[in-house]
A protein has these predicted regions:
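Long, charged/polar, soluble alpha-helical segments
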Residues: 24-152
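N-terminal secretory signal peptides that target proteins for export/translocation
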Residues: 1-5
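Bacterial N-terminal signal peptides
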Residues: 8-21
Length: 152
């Protein structure tokens, strides 16, 4: 009975090590995707109202598209294990138009990060879907900027 328990424990440890090394390997092969995840979470944080006020339709759509892009990247087994709230801090003194412009910059960085040539055919499809969501998010943030500028 003890030898069976030892064997099960050894098999569990081996499975854990294999899973960890596979995750590390994917991350090493696609560091740009990890940068894109960070940029997308950071852009998302800039789109959240600092006073927790109501988001306009364009901002809601942009956040939705960012979430979808993050999900597509994670479907490609490129997951850094971080949640949406794990991002660099947002400057609390930045006004709303500044936050929107910063979100555009971060979305552009994420787009550039994942736009690199992909040799994995499976990942190419997910890459394309993620880029479509990123481009839609960019469009919605531009719309939000136009709304803000029209009210100034």
């Amino acid at each position: 009975m003890k030898s069976l328990l030892k064997l099960a424990l050894a098999a569990s440890v081996l499975a854990l090590l294999l899973a960890f090394s596979a995750t590390t390997s994917v991350a090493q092969e696609h560091p740009a995707y990890l940068h894109a995840l960070t940029d997308l979470r950071h852009a998302r944080a800039h789109l959240e109202r600092p006073d927790h006020g109501e988001l306009r339709e364009q901002e809601k759509k942009a956040i939705h598209e960012i979430d979808e892009a993050i999900n597509e990247i994670k479907k490609a087994s490129i997951d850094d294990g971080k949640d949406l709230n794990d991002h660099p801090p947002v400057d609390a003194k930045m006004d709303w138009p500044g936050r929107l412009h910063r979100a555009i910059e971060l979305i552009n960085k994420a787009h550039n990060d994942i736009a690199r040539e992909e040799d994995n055919h499976f990942a190419q499809g997910l890459q394309q879907k993620a880029m479509e969501h990123i481009d839609k998010a960019h469009h919605h943030v531009e719309e939000a900027i136009e709304v803000v500028q029209s009210r100034m």
